[in-house]
């Protein structure tokens, strides 16, 4: 009898060991997926194939070099107008375009009485850095611009509005949540969190839901280790809660293929009641129609939405 029991116990132990090894390998694979996929996305300096000069838009810009709290030099371009109603800080996306593409927006806003400062995120263009931080550390870039504005007498008592697109939109929301000196927000196509965006895009590429959702917490774990656990709660869906009574305009397109629409709904679940929204049909990631990117007034619906928001809250 005992002779029969011993082999059973041995096989039970063997099966437990095999199951443990398989579980370990499975978890190891899940841990390796985020860095394997993200490495080529974030461990680089973006050198743009196309950049623009202010003169291309019949503008004059003051070129700035601003240093962040963590020692990164940020390139920025200031388009000033006398007695501005507000100064708008422009922030672009993860890999493109250069923020200099928004000189057309700066020209348009100047015609309406608004100054602009366009800055290249760390690890982009003429800014320093070799790691894209997905909106976690880029709030320090925004803070450097805000500190410059606050140091200039010409901007005394002038409201500050942050305007971001895609990862820049996420950075804009994170920035207004962390920087009290910012008075207003315009965000286009922001993701609710990076791990949400990662999971949503896996689903868009045809990955089974079970895999996409299983990988998501490992993406979060990876970004926490990579960017520091002090950034763990710095996500747009959390930072929007800190808006207080400041005005905000959030925009998204329903069929966005880069930052799927569920990110917008997640952010809005936590948004204060005064937050204004505009949703476009189709896949228009930059919200402005492609043929009007450099001349936003040519997209009347887009232009009216933004100017209407600015005039409503900062026009007097």
What are these regions (language model features)?
Residues 14-67, 77:
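An N-terminal hydrophobic leader/cap segment in hydrolases
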Residues 95-108, 121:
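The serine-hydrolase catalytic nucleophile loop
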Residues 108-128:
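Conserved alpha/beta-hydrolase
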Residues 132-153:
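Alpha/beta-hydrolase active-site loop
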Residues 175-229:
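Hydrolase active-site cap/lid region
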Residues 243-244, 249-252, 256:
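Short beta-strand/loop motif that positions the catalytic acidic residue
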Residues 260-269:
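Short alpha-helix in the alpha/beta-hydrolase fold that links the catalytic acid
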Residues 269-316:
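C-terminal catalytic histidine-bearing segment of alpha/beta-hydrolase fold enzymes
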